[in-house]
Amino acid sequence: MATPCIQNAFRRKTLPVRIGDLFVGSEHSIKIQSMTTTATTDVDGTVRQICALQELGCDIVRVTVQGLREVHACEHIKDRLIQQNISIPLVADIHFFPQAAIHVVDCVDKVRINPGNYVDKRNMFTGKIYSDEQYAHSLEHLMNKFSPLVEKCKRLGKAMRIGVNHGSLSERVTQRYGNTIEGMVYSALEYAEVCVAMDYHDVIFSMKSSNPKVMVAAYRSLAYELDQREWSYPLHLGVTEAGSGTAGIVKSAVGIGTLLSEGLGDTIRCSLTGSPINEIPICIDLLKQTTELSERWGEADNPFAIHSSKQLGTRNTLNTPPWDNVYGLLINLTDVQLLTAEPIELLQCLGIDTTTGKIDPTTPEGVVVPKAMRSSPIVSEIEKHLLVFNKEDAPILNPMNEEEWLSEETLSAPFVYFEVTDIHTARRFFSLRQHSTQPVCLSFSLDPHLSKNEAIIDLSARLGALLLDGLGSCVLLDFVDIKLSRTLGFLILQSANIRSVTVEYVSCPGCGRTLFDLLAVSQRIRERTKHLPGGLKIAVMGCIVNGPGEMADADFGYVGSKPGMIDLYVKHKCVKSCIPIENAEEELVQLLKEHGVWKEPE
């Protein structure tokens, strides 16, 4: 048996950046970050939430600073934390108001700014065209407005995060580069150049998006551009507006897990809608399941290559209806399941309504069964609705045997199963077979000892990393819980932008700017709209500071505009404003009807 040369990962080398009493960078552990949801002016409530976050394992906490009232509140918050001997670093989140950053840096450990709105106007999609002269003048204006903050941070020894968000790029950058990954990268680099010119290096970067595919590509591109310039600045990872529940965990794990597996990332946050308390255990599980493996794998020559299907192999779907140009999901059924399950219950678990024969949108394309069970009555019943494959009809490749991967017997099979034990071995497999057009079914099983959240994170990180690069032809999931298999399989396919079978929801985690009960409203909107067809994306955003921009690719948006009032959006355009919140959900339904996407629940 050949010993595989696994495509390993190791931490990208980054500078140490001091934030209060702790350091961030590749020579230090990856830190967990969160953000308070209390009003920053509620000093007591904010301090209580910060203390609760620290007790759970949060390393860095951020608060929103809209203006001078919040600046003064930060002074009191920091004093209270010092009095209670709480050393967790405090970060101020700044949008649209540079003077707040200049003042608050005196009392916090780090400031976060958004290049899309710190100096320039946020893009309002007016179609304005910048000449080269106007663009150069705008860069000079950026230098003049941004340099005072850089100078003060440098003088006081305070850190800064330059946090780019997809969808909230400045008008100038969007006009030149579009709302693209390139635009995100150049937005960050413009601010980085000011910092470098002023010899200020306590800088961290982030490139967030609610779309994991965009987010991963943006971080990879920025890391490449920074390292080309020998600027070894740390990265903070996050999928912004990931949403709530299992879907939010899946999105975060697909995006963050992929990058951690490539050695990128020095701090992380899982931006889940609801209490920030719920984010910390997910972050801990995510780090546990990715970094421990990476440490064992060791160092590689090409630690964070910008992977693509073109580099690592092509994706060919199995040419069997209904899989033409569709990435299929298969469920493995064991002989024990087939022999012991009640037929009606098993069909329902697969998403088949035994009364009407209707198929749920999250029903898999097919099942894989032992050949000996193919003629059983239950399999015959399943075959009326789904494709059925005999497990023995295609080779199941050993992930540790490279000779088997390339053998004549393997390559002559109609398709193969490849058992994915880790991301880097799978990438090695596709790299060696990059000229093969043979369909590959990625096979996944789960450790039965994992908790539900650990299982969600493990599968999302392993499968998501490969799907984002367009690898494989279909997925075979081998779990005891068939319903969980279906749910996770399609959520991961949706997070990787490969298939969309249900409505996708984008919702921010909430912060001190949030103007309504974000979790409750998000859940109600989900209940009202979850029956609508896949491909639709609905955003629920707590305020207008980032809401309109950061729901970049949503079809419809529900955004808090002022206390008790909601604005409704179609794409980037506000079409209904200042709707009383008690009427807003019904108005959203009416808007969906006006645009022809509404249908009544069955």
Curated annotation (Swiss-Prot):
Residues annotated for [4Fe-4S] cluster binding in this entry: 508, 511, 543, 550
SUPFAM superfamilies given in the database record: Nitrite and sulphite reductase 4Fe-4S domain-like
Catalysed reaction equations from the record: (2E)-4-hydroxy-3-methylbut-2-enyl diphosphate + oxidized [flavodoxin] + H2O + 2 H(+) = 2-C-methyl-D-erythritol 2,4-cyclic diphosphate + reduced [flavodoxin]
Annotated cofactor note: Binds 1 [4Fe-4S] cluster.
Cofactor: [4Fe-4S] cluster
Protein family according to the UniProt entry: Belongs to the IspG family.
Protein name according to UniProt: 4-hydroxy-3-methylbut-2-en-1-yl diphosphate synthase (flavodoxin)
Gene field: ispG
